[in-house]
From Swiss-Prot:
Domain of life (superkingdom): Viruses
Protein name: Gene 38 protein
Organism in which the protein naturally occurs: Mycobacterium phage L5 (Mycobacteriophage L5)
Length: 50
């Protein structure tokens, strides 16, 4: 359970850092809403919009 939460936090942090880098370019065609699927215990996927 703790590994799943840690993996989700690491994945979220990596995605946010990538979004911050992309957003800093000033490109108007960049869409910040990206669905990220986090696997929950039991094999269920939980979509998170970033």
């Amino acid at each position: 359970m703790k590994k799943t939460i840690a993996a989700a936090i690491i994945g979220l942090a990596a995605t946010l850092s990538l979004s911050a880098c992309e957003g800093g370019t000033g490109s108007s065609d960049y869409t910040p809403s990206v669905p990220v699927f986090i696997q929950m215990p039991g094999g269920q996927l939980f979509p998170v919009m970033i």
